[in-house]
Amino acid sequence: MGIPAAFRWLSTKYPKIISPVVEEKALVMEDGTVVPVDATQPNPNGEEFDNLYLDMNGIVHPCSHPEDRPAPSDEEEMMVEVFKYTERVVNMVRPRKLLMIAVADGVAPRAKMNQQRSRRFRAAQDAKEKEEDKQQLLKMLQKEKGSTAKEEPIETVVKKAFDSNSITPGTPFMDILAASLRYWCAYKLNTDPAWAKMKVIISDATVPGEGEHKIMEFVRSQRNSPEHDPNTRHVIYGLDADLIMLGLATHEPHFRVLREDVFFQQGKARMCKLCGQKGHDERNCRGEAKEKAGEFDEKDKAEPLKPFIWLHVSILREYLAIELNIPNLPFRWDLERAIDDWVFMCFFVGNDFLPHLPALEIRENGIETLMAIWKDNLPVMGGYVTKDGHVDLDRAQYILSGLAKQEDSIFRRRKETEDRREAGFKRRKLNNQQGNNRGGAHDSPLSGRGGRKGAPEANGPPVGMNLFPVASIPKPVITHDMVVNRANVANKSAASVLKSQIQSLVAQTQEKPEGDEPKEENPEAKTPPSALGKRKAELIEEGTATASDAASDTETPATTSSEEGPIDTVRLWEEGYADRYYEQKFKVDAKDIAFRHKVARAYVEGLAWVLMYYFQGCPSWEWFYPYHYAPFAADFVDLGKMKISFEKGRISRPFEQLMSVLPAASRHAIPEVFHDLMTQEDSPILDFYPEDFEIDLNGKKMSWQGIALLPFIEMPRLLDAMKTKSHLLSAEDKARNAPGHDVLLISDSHPGLYEDISSHFYSKKQAVPEFKLDPKRSDGLSGKVRKIEGYVPHGSLVYPLERNTMPDVDYDRSMSVNYDMPTSSHIHKSMLLRGLKMPTPALDRSDVDFVRSKGRGAGRSFGGVPLRNNYNGGGRGDRINYAGGPPRGGGGGGRGRGGYQQDRGYGNGYGGGGGSGGGGGGGGYGNGYGGYQQPAAPGQQSWQPPPPPGYPGFGVGVPPPPPPAHASGGGYNQGYGNQGYGGQNYRNDRYPPGPPPHGGYQGGGYPGGGYQGGGHQGGYQGQYHPPHGQSQDRRHDNS
């Protein structure tokens, strides 16, 4: 998912969702014999798993260009690495029922192609620049070494990198990968006892859809089956952050995400990408050949394997149950719907289909800001924002309007933070320079000891001067970083170079003592992550976010210095930023307000598209967001009047996607008949493939954070141009361009299913070409299977690659059939299934306190402070309220810190820090929700939300009846972040039928909105019956 640093943010905010994987390693005997892992044994992690889903993008990318070892020399070596990595993951999880492998993304929706196009063009551009730097390094090294160079040619040191753009549907590489994985899975079914009863589904790149979304489509399809076991335990492997959101969207609590611990030994030097040696990175590469450890390098020590971690979706659900719960809503509380709303709000901060809103950054508590807005508005919205993957636009308007209230403040606060960081860097840089200067004076040879006392000889050196032969002075070592920096200087504009020179001269005359030589600085040159593929880019972004959040003191000039970066002419922190934004980014008149609303409507369409894509599957294969930039929150108006609908549209063919997303530099992955369309001057679509394009940093510092301003593909033009060449395709090319099918592989050891398939397809009867699986005989798998044309069972299994690295199998005991997922007329419901046994709660009271303490003021600390509520006129006011609706009254609840009353009988009066208006929380502000103390269910802690009927431990349903005796409460006494959801006293025998009244004389800012300033009493205006012996006057009715 396109949320940089999302995984790190989640694991920091909710620490218990992460745990290390216990991995059993193969044993190496003294004689070198390797004893493999016995995966038939119980899982060492203490829990058995049913289904494992592999998003192979997260395996293919690290195997094709690893960080800790040299890259594979060819595709066959790469396939072997893929086999090893996959087997390691399978042995960790040990699935007992099913393994699904999404070999790679198939043809993607058009909305995704734009992002793929940007990444691949950037990757090609970065690879070109990197190759030019390599060649320049070679020339400089050859010139320097001359006749003293070693016998081996230097060209063998620098290798050409694998083109990651080949990992795209329709390329020959993807054909090789799919065939290799089909062989390997069949081989394991024949030889590994742990695979004997496992079903394997392979969905290769010929099957349309992104890998992770094909996996989720399978999960939803099985979930809709009446025979589905609701307690199935799922594990999905992948490096994408959106796997977490997709796991939540399944509403399957027994779900885990498996991934590498990408932060393991983060500070350790990586292997050089240029020469393949350890101990330095490519910035400091000197182009020297590797020294062998032993005659054949057999003594070279292998790096320790990177550990893996679990992300527990069930524990994340527990955290969200605490964070999102709002007691005493005027409608039924439903955790499943609240989780869907939370996932929807995360889309605003980033996704792969839309640019994020300018005011929202995950590093600036963007998600917490939206959560605060959602909490304030939920009671007045009348329900949840989403339902089963559909968005209620009237309620979404509340969220965006609440964000618009603090948009200006967020931009100003962001600028202040950047300025402080910049000033801190300059201060540290100056201190370091002054320290170096003092050290240089202290260590001067003139002050050295030794030599004769007295005046020096007239023609001799000063006394104490240490003399060295000129030939002994080492020459400056040429490194790759020097080449890159010289190229960067050469690419600067004349004005930028002149400015830098003037500034350096001024600095030297003002700061440098006489006699000091100027020192050349080599700012760190980072490899843009787009060159490493989608998954690698996200991991680098996570690491960058971590560095910026946790250790801003260590930032380098390349990341912080505004002197080297372009000037931000939009200046979001200054008045008039919206006009400048639309003039410069969209090239439209600043007074064209209708255009702003048009952009906002397209963005809302995109949000609706993304939500349906995550919860129901792709709503349209042709829709896309037609702008490079997002609108402001203030531009979203009258959303409730919009009518959004999508047409399924046409699914592109693989070659059409290749022509849509690949640059001309990667045309080797495209059939040769189309090459002229990408390169020739007379091509009608030549403008789709610019060699040079603008990168708009859009206020960022690093080039990889910028926006590639590429022209959007006009699909009718592209298709018309391709039609003129399609008849020239070879039969092999046409086969690669055809849509494919999922394949199901089983062993003859699988009871029931193997017999059913054999009798239907390969017996003398052979009645039908397809049949529906019986879940009772297939161990829970639903769907249809079809015979593969030309496939003959019980033949030989042949290794598909040339060097025969893996053996052939003479008698293949596995069987392969085409597989179709079951279809259903029912939509995927956001609900827990009947018969589900919830996982044992993992959080205790200390975890709840931790979440609430971390949430104190969350979403209001960046931009929301020190905004004040100006509605209460003259009072001190409090932090701004995000809830929609006009102000009605004010008043100083508690210590006179005002609020205002909402017009739906819901009290939003802000109580003071304790006292009568403390809102039950002893501080913060009282939102007047009028909580009441629920009795604890059996096995449930008193602080947990009430469970729904039949599902202990989670507050997703109506609360149980109140106890017979009257219970006084403070609701959630600490509130959420000490926001003080107020309490009330009630008696069970005095309530009328229906939900208890909301509001209450003890809570919500005394009483529920403040009474000292004449504000209206808060709370939902329901019927109230005081306990016996108490006066009705204590309610402080509105007057």
Curated annotation (Swiss-Prot):
Gene3D superfamilies xref list: 1.25.40.1050, 3.40.50.12390
Comp. bias regions, Basic and acidic residues: 414-425, 511-524
UniProt feature coiled coil, ranges: 119-147
Family matches, as PROSITE patterns: ZF_CCHC
Gly residues compositional bias, start-end: 886-899, 968-983, 1000-1021
Pfam family, one: XRN_N
Superkingdom, natural source: Eukaryota
This protein's name: 5'-3' exoribonuclease 2
Species per Swiss-Prot/TrEMBL record: Chaetomium globosum (strain ATCC 6205 / CBS 148.51 / DSM 1962 / NBRC 6347 / NRRL 1970) (Soil fungus)
Organismal lineage: Eukaryota, Fungi, Dikarya, Ascomycota, Pezizomycotina
